[in-house]
Amino acid sequence: MAPKKAKRRAAAEGGSSNVFSMFDQTQIQEFKEAFTVIDQNRDGIIDKEDLRDTFAAMGRLNVKNEELDAMMKEASGPINFTVFLTMFGEKLKGADPEDVITGAFKVLDPEGKGTIKKQFLEELLITQCDRFSQEEIKNMWAAFSPDVGGNVDYKNICYVITHGDAKDQE
């Protein structure tokens, strides 16, 4: 048991404590909630199996080991919350907010179609982190109505979030 604790402590010390000054308390809490969702076995460390289970929970059951390995290699060691926050801090430094939001949606769009199923997005919004109320869901669908196939154009949502107006359809 002691070697495991020492390993975790060493991993925690590997992350920069400065990362906490990059975000306000609300943002840190949101990252903590995201970390908790991904840390499926609740051991305080995100590992390959946590990633696999998270993808499975989102309906993506055929994630290749190579994809998971590539994600794990983005960290220099075990991914505890400090390392997780540091990784996001580094990724967000100088990033365009539209690119960041689009990148978050792309995780949910493994085929790269630029759309997400309405039912899937709605389920995530009412069950994860800052849960949407039924009224908020209704308002969102009024602003961003899905197409006849039930697909939502998340690129338009990202544009409106960052620019305030709907993108002209060409």
Swiss-Prot record:
Origin organism lineage: Eukaryota, Metazoa, Chordata, Craniata, Vertebrata
GO MF term list: calcium ion binding
Modified residues (Phosphoserine): S16, S17, S76
UniProt source species: Oryctolagus cuniculus
Name listed for the protein in its UniProt record: Myosin regulatory light chain 2, skeletal muscle isoform type 1
Miscellaneous notes: This chain binds calcium.
SMART domains: EFh (SM00054)
InterPro entries cross-referenced by the UniProt entry: EF-hand-dom_pair, EF_Hand_1_Ca_BS, EF_hand_dom, Myosin_RLC
Residues reported to bind Ca(2+): D39, N41, D43, D50
